[in-house]
Amino acid sequence: MKNIPFLLTITILWLASSCSKKNDFTLEGKLDNLSSDTILIYYQVPQFQLDTLICKEGSFTYTISPDTFTMFSLIVDAEETIPVFADKGQTVYISGTIDEPNIEGEGENKLMNEIIHALQAIPSNEIPQKVDSFIQSNPDSFTSLYLLDKYYARNDSANFEQLETLTKALHGIIKDSPYMTQLQAKIVSLKNYKKNQSILSLMGFDKEGKS
């Protein structure tokens, strides 16, 4: 009888550990040709925050316990990024290189991997049309939001009117995310920039304000 409290404690601890693992998200991977053993993790959903990931000969494991759907990007040299979508109980594996990754996972991760490989397989002049088609077919996807940011909001020469049209067509939970708010702020900034450039052009000035 004396062993019952001990066995009960062990059982409770085991159950707690099992439940914890079911709520964990694990990112595993091995990336080739990394210029640093440190990868910056930039959280975009549900809120902005930063973390770091240390690699050992390109290999890494990163585990979190997300309360809700989470999105973050792996950043190397402040340039190349790999978006990752995290949810409870999921595992994602990344291989390849930082600029040509292979993402093994479910849901948004699978969707992201498919569009990454689709874009890599076509000429650069066909990428805008492919991106637009994907976004129009997946208006409630965080992958679409990422593509809008990468190929439109970060590109000064992108079609601003198309950016506005595609953004307005998005719906679902992504509309209320901080990432969407950030994208909308970029659109306002880009709109003001385009407006100022048009005024300067009409006045006979170049983009640097010189006549």
What does each model-found stretch correspond to?
Residues 1-17:
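Sec-dependent bacterial lipoprotein signal peptides
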Residues 19-138:
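A non-transmembrane, solvent-exposed segment enriched in polar/low-complexity residues
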Residues 33, 125, 155-158, 174, ...:
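Alpha-helix capping and inter-helical loop/turn segments
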Residues 122-128, 157-164:
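Helix-turn-helix repeat elements of alpha-solenoid scaffolds
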Residues 131, 160-170, 198-202:
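Alpha-helical repeat scaffolds
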Residues 137-141, 173-181:
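Short solvent-exposed coil/turn linkers within tandem alpha-helical repeat scaffolds
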Residues 140-153:
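Amphipathic alpha-helical repeat scaffolds of TPR domains
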Residues 181-211:
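N-terminal "domain-start" segment that seeds a small globular fold
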